[in-house]
Amino acid sequence: MNLHQTVEREAAAAFAAAGIADSPVVLQPTKNAEHGDFQINGVMGAAKKAKQNPRELAQKVAEALADNAVIESAEVAGPGFINLRLRPEFLAQNIQTALNDARFGIAKTDKPQTVVIDYSSPNLAKEMHVGHLRSSIIGDSISRVLAFMGNTVVRQNHVGDWGTQFGMLVAYLVEQQKDNAAFELADLEQFYRAAKVRFDEDPAFADTAREYVVKLQGGDETVLALWKQFVDISLSHAQAVYDTLGLKLRPEDVAGESKYNDDLQPVVDDLVQKGLAVEDDGAKVVFLDEFKNKEGEPAAFIVQKQGGGFLYASTDLACLRYRVGTLHADRLLYVVDHRQALHFEQLFTTSRKAGYLPENVGAAFVGFGTMMGKDGKPFKTRSGDTVKLVDLLTEAVERAAALVKEKNPELGADEAAKIGKTVGIGAVKYADLSKNRTSNYVFDWDAMLSFEGNTAPYLQYAYTRVQSVFRKAGEWDATAPTVLSEPLEKQLAAELLKFEDVLQSVADTAYPHYLAAYLYQIATLFSRFYEACPILKAESASRNSRLQLAKLTGDTLKQGLDLLGIDVLDVM
């Protein structure tokens, strides 16, 4: 159930009864549970508009909420706030519904969309590094939530598998007579670095590299065979990383830059024909009045370089047109580094003008900040190199396994390693997903692997704590009437029933940290409930009810963490 909507509906009816039906309720959870479950903040605005005394008007609204099936009490506070407390019977009934439904009583959206979400998208011919982590796990979590809420999710891994870097690699391998050799990804990285030096320092080599790019684009069989070898090696590495991270991305989700190669010139020609793109110094440019350059003139969105070459803008336009026209997207999400914000704003504006992005199709740039080291600079190795993602994940698992072994010396090495993988990978992912994605955040091993505070290990341990209760519980009646008599029982019940509200918020805004914050709230609230309300030693009715709350807490934690892409353990 959507608890917020349910309470808001009751409050809106009370507003109508008080003669202010046209005013927004402005409902939000109370900051202090002692004041109730929700607070109405819309009365003061309505009073100002109606030229009435806000406290008197608030009292009318509160009186209209008397004898309500959902709301137990409505108390006026301050200049016109109304604190609402939910009826225990209403909470108990909905706890039963959530407990006995695989979807927790959460309805799928009545307006399902086809959502195309672009995430991860590394450049190929090199190993994935920490810079690829955020897009990969943020995009994966958003896609999981959207699918859970009933949408059709089309994942797109827009890998960088085309362009100058491949011409450089081919030129270098031919020059070194290694074009027929077998090689691995580490070799490709070494070759690429050497080729880049040659490209920057030797004009003749640079010309040769560009010639190979032309051959690649023209379908030369020899060059294409080498290119495919580069791509296959790189994608195999990427998929291994995705599998380690537990991502939903699969090989069939790959739709790289090369996919749109044949569409680039037609898109540019179409923009010219529509009068959007014009020639400027030999390049094809769309001038956008909505954006200004340093001189205050319309900004230039270059779609074709002087000499006929293409850019990211060309590929992204063709890609967007494909996603709307062929994949039938109702909504487009691009999970990309925040530094690309202007590019995507200009892409969307150009696409709207060209008719590639109709008004009934949504498009959003889902930007994210930078992973920082403790020194406040982008996260690097001690030698200043980019941290390879495989190395980071390996270290996470090793550190977590050591911590688990330290806490449980009796564990065998294999069991500690197994638990360590779940805890370590979960810790890395949660440390990221629990932060507002638009912010930079500091990567800190000690903080993320702590069993205290807002961390994956804390939430995973909270889940195992629930499981330990049921290992000792013996028989109990999951269908017995739920009785909520203690304040913490009611508070936990009300919080558990906000699951749908939170998931809908994540689906609407693409901010996974809302879900992380909710799960942490559930875990901390359960800890307080566990300490204050004996479960197994309580008398029969309370025992069953508290076991029901514990069961729903565990199920909610497990489902919520799964939507973040994080596994749980029955024992830690």
Curated annotation (Swiss-Prot):
Disulfide linkage: none
Pfam families in the record: Arg_tRNA_synt_N, DALR_1, tRNA-synt_1d
Xref: NCBIfam families: argS
Catalytic activity: tRNA(Arg) + L-arginine + ATP = L-arginyl-tRNA(Arg) + AMP + diphosphate
Family the entry assigns: Belongs to the class-I aminoacyl-tRNA synthetase family.
Compartments where located: Cytoplasm
Predominant location: cytoplasm
Coiled-coil region(s): none
Superkingdom: Bacteria
GO CC aspect terms: cytoplasm
GO BP terms, alphabetized: arginyl-tRNA aminoacylation
Gene coding for it: argS
Official protein name in the record: Arginine--tRNA ligase
InterPro entries named among the record's database cross-references: aa-tRNA-synth_I_CS (IPR001412), Arg-tRNA-ligase (IPR001278), Arg-tRNA-synth_N (IPR005148), Arg-tRNA-synth_N_sf (IPR036695), ArgRS_core (IPR035684), DALR_anticod-bd (IPR008909), Rossmann-like_a/b/a_fold (IPR014729), tRNAsynth_Ia_anticodon-bd (IPR009080)
GO molecular function ontology, one term from the record: arginine-tRNA ligase activity
Presence of the UniProt keyword Aminoacyl-tRNA synthetase in the record: yes
Native source organism of the sequence: Neisseria meningitidis serogroup A / serotype 4A (strain DSM 15465 / Z2491)
Residue ranges annotated as motif 'HIGH' region: 122-132
EC id: 6.1.1.19
Subunit structure: Monomer.
Key words of the record: Aminoacyl-tRNA synthetase, ATP-binding, Cytoplasm, Ligase, Nucleotide-binding, Protein biosynthesis
